[in-house]
Amino acid sequence: MHAKGARKGCTRKPAAKAPQADDKGQDETMSTQRAKLVVGNWKMHGCLADNAGLLQAVAKGAAELPADVRVGVCVPSPYLAQAQSLLEGSRVVWGVQDISAFTHGAYTGEVAAQMVADFSAAFAIVGHSERRAYHRESAELVAVKTQRALEAGLTPIVCVGETLQEREAGSTEQVVGVQLDEVLAKLSAEEAARIVVAYEPVWAIGTGKSASSGQAQAVHAFLRSRLAAKGASVANVTLLYGGSVKPDNAEELFSQRDIDGGLIGGASLKDQDFLAICKAAAATTAAT
């Protein structure tokens, strides 16, 4: 899938720079010195009136966090302007939950990465399990969307994860490895070092089952080894956990060696819960 360049006649402002992991060598990377990142994924929730209070509360709470805890929210695309208006100048960056694989053209309903960047956004989630399941997004399509995000100056949050059937079949590493490899194959080492990867075990979301911190860490360690094979700088990519993180399990999860934070769903819709998760991330940085 090939996309053409930006539309003629559009003057584009550079996208906001997303907070990046520290630039360390591979040996340092395998330590626990990476900064934490907590990103809220609102999914298809929100309205202008309710969003304002939530965004303002999160911005106020984030101001009290240590510098090595980074915070973001990925809102529905119609609320990008509101997020920019209320969060600009705060510690919180903003983004979207999906982008088009195309840069422009007759693609009704699609939103191009560069359009998102026009709102000084930092993040674009790509390959979320709900997109893969409900919209039949392939690993190849996710890889192309990752490229589009990087070209627009956005930081793609690349989601990978396995279903319950795949986990019970012992195929977890094979599944997430293929999903990640498809993306890495299209990127240079320099480009790959600019992504964020989120592991979301589909089997642990809404199934009554839960992933232990040890299970989550095992997959994160595998993903980091896969990233390291791309290059020393890529080994330092931020790895988020996205399997129903809540205030009561966040600190244990974030204390794991290769878990650098979380991609937060339902809990990101309540400012107290979301900020409690951010504070849990801060507690783990203080302990290292």
Where does each model-flagged region fall?
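Active-site loop-to-helix "anion-binding N-cap" substructures in soluble metabolic enzymes
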Residues: 2, 7, 12, 17, ...
